[in-house]
């Protein structure tokens, strides 16, 4: 099984889960990621998917995770996202042949016009469908949590990690928690998302990989949508810290509601929002 983006957050967890089930794993990535996944793969190849040219390997299955994934930067740098997420996917499809191509996408692909990240991931879905007879399109929803071995970047953009970092800040005066947008047409004025633990996401990916190609979209995400205010409330409850919150203007590219439309038969929710908050608090200590 070939895994692209193997040293990243989701990719490294996938490699670990596959090896624990005795699969042979060929891991690829191209960055200076500080995560050592040598124990979670049988072979590692340093590959920049943006520069792949020609045919490389025939493998049984491919899990294509490599991508640029942040909404905000995609608004400012759309062509960088196109180069990696669309052109890079085209190169992977062309360079490797397989019996089942699993494309890791995003729930944002349901609304590709919302930002460049969503548009380019949707473009990758179209390429996968066009050039593979046997595929599975897997859409993730606001992945959070950790299993203890992954080292995140210092820059924090994820809501739950950002709240945990506020809680774990040194000193008695905790910095404020930014709240981007309080005037959305939602139940409390803030964005609603489906936060899903990395363990449940990866378990779903492994089930899909071990099954036959579905040739359809598989949505891996919690069926319960929660608002930004509700996440902040949960973090305060779990941590016991009533930290400061500062309402700010909306962020470019954010949409009001992104929820799971159809739950995949491969998804099993075992972890809660409270679990994700506890994981983040432990990591940010």
Cite the ranges covered by each PLM segment.
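C-terminal substrate-binding subdomain of Rossmann-fold SDR/epimerase-dehydratase oxidoreductases
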Residues: 162-285
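NAD(P)H-binding glycine-rich loop region in Rossmannoid oxidoreductase-like domains
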Residues: 49-84, 108-112
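Flexible, glycine-rich beta-alpha linker
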Residues: 109-116, 138-158, 185-187
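N-terminal Rossmann NAD(P)H-binding glycine-rich loop of SDR-like oxidoreductase domains
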Residues: 2-20
């Amino acid at each position: 099984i070939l895994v692209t983006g193997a040293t990243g957050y989701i990719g490294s967890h996938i490699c670990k889960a596959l090896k624990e089930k005795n699969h042979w794993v060929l891991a690829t990535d191209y960055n200076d990621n500080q995560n050592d996944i040598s124990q979670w793969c049988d072979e590692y190849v340093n590959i920049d998917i943006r520069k792949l040219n020609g045919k490389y390997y025939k493998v049984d299955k491919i899990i294509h995770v490599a991508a640029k994934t942040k909404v905000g930067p995609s608004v400012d740098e759309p062509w960088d996202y196109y180069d990696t997420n669309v052109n890079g996917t085209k190169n992977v499809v062309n360079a490797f042949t397989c019996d089942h191509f699993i494309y890791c996408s995003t729930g944002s692909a349901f609304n590709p016009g919302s930002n460049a990240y969503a548009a380019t991931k949707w473009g990758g879905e179209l390429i996968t469908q066009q050039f593979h007879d046997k595929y599975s399109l897997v859409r993730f929803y606001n992945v959070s949590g950790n299993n203890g071995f992954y080292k995140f970047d210092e820059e924090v953009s994820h809501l739950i990690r950002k709240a945990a970092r506020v809680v774990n800040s040194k000193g008695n005066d905790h910095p404020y928690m930014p709240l981007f947008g309080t005037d959305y047409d939602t139940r409390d004025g803030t964005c609603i998302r489906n936060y899903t633990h990395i363990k449940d996401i990866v378990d779903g990916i492994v089930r899909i990989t071990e099954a036959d190609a579905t040739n359809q979209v598989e949505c891996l995400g919690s069926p319960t949508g929660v608002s930004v205010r509700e996440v902040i409330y949960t973090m305060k409850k779990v941590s016991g810290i009533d930290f400061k919150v500062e309402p700010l203007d909306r962020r470019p590219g954010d949409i009001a509601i992104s929820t799971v439309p159809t739950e995949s038969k491969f998804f099993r929710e075992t972890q809660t929002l409270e679990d994700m908050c506890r994981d983040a608090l432990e990591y940010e200590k």
